[in-house]
Amino acid sequence: MAVYAIADLHLPAGNKPMDIFGDHWIGHFERIRADWLDRVKPEDVVLLPGDLSWAMRLEEAGEDLRGIGALPGTKVLLRGNHDYWWSSIGRVRRALPEGMYALQNDALMLGGRLYAGSRGWTLPGPDAAEEDVKIYNRERMRLEMSLQHARRLSQDAPITAMMHFPPLTDEETGFSDILEKYGVSDCVYGHLHGPAIYGAVRGVRGAVRYHQVSCDGLDFRLYTLYGDQPIEKMTGEA
């Protein structure tokens, strides 16, 4: 069983194409879909850490969710900052096609590996707004709840964490202390685009290996976590 990851698909919800952000986004989901169909088998897992659709309401996200659901593999979803369609977790889960799972304050075991995570937030610096600090602290609690649930499922199974926002930077430790506390082996995240991708944290920091998986930084191909040769190509286009 291979495990892949890709974030920030930003599917159009019928009326918001991504090529307004640059020609490299033209036909981006068709490129992702072609790579997905070429590589992913029914028994594989694909992690989708946020910003799936521009839809504003759950009903409007249906076409985008069905488009992902029709692709092979088990899909594990996490909310991003632009997933405005993501309403109550119960409604979201009822709306998902078969083989798609949404994480929120909990965890999932697939193929002997645990999956947990939370959206995260902008890491607060010394001049951070009070509201940002409040949201950041709430996301820390949600991440811990998810990882606690993972450890209730298994004390020794490996954990892969999903986050949307970067969990740390070269200057800020961010969420890394919580990830290390629960023995997370790998953490995938998205959110960044364009030149910001170049400065993203990758590789082992502390006891966790970090993977930046925004789709435009992967040339609109899936990133391989386990079970295949990893993709090294980075575009860093705006």
Question: Which residue stretches match the model-derived regions?
Answer:
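Core catalytic region of metal-dependent phosphoesterases/phosphodiesterases
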Residues: 2, 15-110, 175-184, 208, ...
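Short, hydrophobic/glycine-enriched beta-strand segments
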Residues: 2-8
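Conserved catalytic scaffold of divalent metal-dependent phosphoesterases
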Residues: 9-16, 84-171, 228-237
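Active-site environment of divalent metal-dependent phosphoester hydrolases
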Residues: 10-15, 53-59, 81-89, 109, ...
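Binuclear metal-dependent phosphoesterase catalytic core
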Residues: 17-18, 23, 27, 34, ...
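His/acidic metal-ligating clusters that form di-metal
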Residues: 31-45, 69, 130-199
